[in-house]
């Protein structure tokens, strides 16, 4: 698998993305938890913000939010294992390993604590991060993402919305479907009507690589094998949220109804839910100003350089 050179480089390119699209964003590659990860960076001063993408996207999903924040924040948009231009090894797509990847990336970047934002899969991962290492995060904004404390009575009626995941999660079939990118393109257009073809290509292009197609399949399969049973059998019931958190949801989100996100219980006492009228599944692209404003609410006035990472 080929990569640009080590260190800071010019814009990382995908089919459909021009080299002049985002001139203020630098790119680097770091080793975290034994995997080479790609990160896009912008801004030179202010509190640090870490952005985690959803599926089938990568760092580029945050481009408009980065533009909103870079003037007074240091912004880092990470390509998760298997996505974008990060390495795509044959294993490690369970939430526990992905959590370790991100924490190791923070260490490699020299960031003791950050404000975290995650979209969709990145939002689900974000909840695990703030539960696993709360002292590493000054605040968390989840975008178009479920939280771990969804009551069964609210979750079960929503399961039909995820019918398409059956095409992606099973070994062999999932990789085959993902490589052909048609379902991925449908997901992107379904979630954000009017998405330009060039942006669809930017996000689906990496999935044509066999290793990345398998990574996408494994991501969904590990959710079926681990996270869904954990939630079904009360694995999050005694995990208490101690980091200030805000969940943004769109009234037109095809994958997640805002009505299902309320009533998290006392475990999620610091979680607020904010519903954005008329918005769909890709808020970082549809309403970047609103997402950036939410991040600003939870970001400290000054970088939390003195924070001590949790073990």
Role assignments for model-derived ranges:
Residues 58-59, 124, 279-280:
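A short, glycine- and basic residue-enriched loop/turn
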